[in-house]
C-alpha cells in the first residue's frame, strides 16, 4: 500500500503523461525532423541520386530521434525521482535528458561511422575528437538543443485543468 504522504510518481500523473505524449513527443518529432533536414548536407547521403532513399533516411532518423528522446526523458524522470509536473526539478531533468541523449548519440555515431561504416560525414561536417574518435558536432549539438527545447515548449504549452 502506498503512503498517502509520499509524492505522486510521474508515471501515475495524468498531466505528466499527457505532457509527454501530447506535447513533448510532437514537439520533439517536429524539431528533430527539421534538424535532420537541415543537417543533411553534413552527411554524404546528401549526394545520393535517389530522393526516395534520402527521404526514407530522414524519416528513419527522425523516428529514431523520437525514440531516443523519449527514452532519455524517461531515464531523466526516473533518475531524478520525479513526481507530478509541479514537483519536477526541471534543471535536473534537463541535465539528465541531455546527458543520456549526448551519450547515446556519441556511441551511435562511433558505431555507425567507425565500426559499421553505415554512414559517413561530408567535408562540411564539423567534427570533434573525443578519446581518439572523430564525432560529428551536429548530431551531438542536436541532443543539447532539441530535446530541452521540445520539453520547454511542451511545458510552456501545457495548461493545467481549471478547478471548478
Where do the protein language model's features map onto the residues?
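Aromatic-rich, lipid-facing transmembrane alpha helices and their immediate juxtamembrane interface loops
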Residues: 1-164
Amino acid at each position: 500500500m502506498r503512503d498517502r504522504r509520499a509524492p505522486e510518481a510521474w508515471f501515475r500523473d495524468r498531466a505528466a503523461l499527457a505532457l509527454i505524449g501530447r506535447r513533448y513527443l510532437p514537439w520533439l518529432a517536429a524539431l528533430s525532423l527539421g534538424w535532420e533536414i537541415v543537417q543533411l548536407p553534413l552527411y554524404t547521403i546528401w549526394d545520393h541520386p535517389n530522393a526516395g532513399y534520402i527521404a526514407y533516411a530522414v524519416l528513419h532518423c527522425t523516428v529514431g530521434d523520437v525514440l531516443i528522446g523519449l527514452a532519455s526523458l524517461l531515464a531523466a524522470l526516473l533518475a531524478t525521482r520525479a513526481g507530478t509536473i509541479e514537483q519536477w526539478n526541471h534543471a535536473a531533468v534537463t541535465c539528465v535528458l541531455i546527458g543520456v541523449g549526448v551519450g547515446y548519440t556519441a556511441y551511435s555515431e562511433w558505431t555507425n561511422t567507425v565500426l559499421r561504416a553505415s554512414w559517413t560525414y561530408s567535408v562540411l561536417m564539423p567534427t570533434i575528437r573525443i578519446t581518439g574518435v572523430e564525432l560529428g558536432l551536429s548530431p551531438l549539438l542536436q541532443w543539447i538543443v532539441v530535446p530541452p527545447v521540445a520539453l520547454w515548449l511542451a511545458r510552456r504549452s501545457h495548461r493545467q485543468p481549471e478547478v471548478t
